[in-house]
Amino acid sequence: VPIFTRLMSTEEYGTYTVYLSWLQILTIMTSLYLFNGVYDNAMAKYEKQRDEYTSAMQGLTLVITGAVFALYCFTSGFWEKILNLPKSMILLMFLEALLSPALSYWSGRQRFEYRYRILVCVTILQALMNPIASLVLIRINGGTAMMRILGIVGVQVCICVPIIVFQFCKGKEFFSKEYWRTALVCWCSFSSAV
């Protein structure tokens, strides 16, 4: 959003864009982007078990994110130097990487089942709340990258936590050997094709 280039210094805006770049890489590592092609294929394959599959994929993503976070915790000093970001931003990055796949799974399911009305409402809500929350935080606490990031992560928490709870309650499946194996095999075949 162009307004943030005016409210934040060049250095702070640069830090924010570095954060976004590393977040994309972290999200690939922690979610394996299972919510893309793999998830769509499974929606067709497991037509009667979509809730269970969705919650199991969410569980797999949480386990992978937890494993990568544990690795980070043991080597945090090394990663802070490589990423050139403070620990607080890296922790927010992990929180966002933990939460955002739930929204992606939910959105993918809505699209697959042609339920666009609620998807559009949630998308518009997020599109409005992200800059508003960030603007408020930047105005109150100064034009820092941390305030911009806190605004986005705060909105992610408000939207994604209820989705995570809803999907786990509905699917009641954290681990499924069949679903996890199928997802990882599909992911391997997709990634090797790229």
Regions found by a protein language model. Give the residues of each.
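Structural signal for membrane-spanning alpha-helices in multi-pass inner-membrane proteins
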Residues: V1-T5, I28, Y72, S76, ...
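Membrane-interface helix-capping segments at transmembrane helix termini in multi-pass transporters
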Residues: M8-V18, A44-A56, G66-F94, I140-I149
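Small-residue-rich midsections of specific transmembrane alpha-helices
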Residues: T17-M43, A97-L103, P162, V194
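Transmembrane-helix boundary and interhelical linker motifs in polytopic inner-membrane proteins
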Residues: T5-Y13, L26-L60, R111-R117
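Interfacial/gating helices of multi-pass transporter permease domains
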Residues: I3-I25, A145, R181-S189
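Alpha-helical transmembrane segments of multi-pass membrane proteins
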Residues: I25-M29, L62-A70, I82-W106, V120-I124, ...
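Alpha-helical transmembrane segments of multipass membrane proteins
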Residues: P2, Y105-R109, P131-V136, F190
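Hydrophobic alpha-helical transmembrane segments
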Residues: I90-F94, V120-C169, T182-V185
